[in-house]
Amino acid sequence: MTTTLRPAEPLQQTPDGGRSRVYDVCVNSRRVGAVRLSTDPRFGAASGVIDELRVDEPDRRRGRGTVAALASEEVLRSWGCVEVQISVPADAEAALRMARSLGYTERSRNMVKELAAEPPELPEGVEVRPMTEAEYGEWEARAKAGFAQNWIDRGVPEEQARTKAEDSHRRYLPEGLATPGVAIHVVVRDGLPAGFLWTGRIELEPGSWAAFVYDIEVDEAQRGRGYGRALMLLAERIAREAGDTRLGLHVFAGNTPAIRLYESLGFRTTLVNSAKELR
């Protein structure tokens, strides 16, 4: 039996070169699932995405998903894509195994915590305050550079990574410190900034919003002193005071100390984000 992809709709195109299309997964012309492919506007038309790959239950565990994934990669190659991205639910063990077997490498993961009714107290002696306008410009330049470098370190071309960083700050901090729903705080040691926390809100799933940690940074000289934990507890307080019951974040693969911290605070991984070169 032959597994193929058959277009289920016309090719959708955007003025900036973006593409998307839904395909039926077929076995000898019999529909057994569906695939949705697109290009990623955050990284440009050369970065493809398998947004969804579904095989109907009766046809699972027969290699249909693997063949459909490989066929999807060929479609993305024909679009001029040089990489493909996927986001797999953390509890989808079969899909995660398939991704690893096909050569996908984890780049990052999304994590979420269900918040307690009472916000946590900050550790004794920890001083935090809102960021000032005088501090904002230097912080933003450093934050964008660090965010871009994290993507570069994981195989994203420098130009795409820097575009992604600029786009993220433009989207989520359009008015700087005055952006509605955004808070940027500083943790202070001996009167000097020792770390920063940027929080806001995000749509975790369609129609479902939650508080979100966009960035957290502790100065290298101050690490190992509990400031990262204190800033995360502050994020929980901010979220609960705003009425949110969940707090989400995004962490890059390989940042083991951060992942361990988040897990110790009760965060669980919801999505594993991976990529593969198509060259």
Could you say what each language-model-derived stretch is?
Residues 23, 28, 105, 109-135, ...:
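C-terminal "cap" of GNAT-fold acetyltransferases
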Residues 50-62, 88-90, 214-223:
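A short, internal acetyl-CoA/4′-phosphopantetheine-binding micro-motif in the GNAT/acyltransferase core
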Residues 59, 63-71, 222, 226-231:
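Conserved acetyl-CoA pyrophosphate-binding loop and the N-cap/start of the following alpha-helix
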Residues 2-28, 36, 159-184:
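Active-site rim helix/loop that mediates acceptor-substrate recognition in acyltransferases
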Residues 3-14, 126-154:
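A short beta-loop-alpha structural element at the N-terminal edge
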Residues 66, 90-108, 229, 253-271:
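Conserved active-site alpha-helix within GNAT-family acetyltransferase domains
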Residues 76-89, 239-250:
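Conserved GNAT acetyl-CoA-binding A-motif
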Residues 24, 30-39, 47-49, 54, ...:
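Conserved beta-strand in the GNAT
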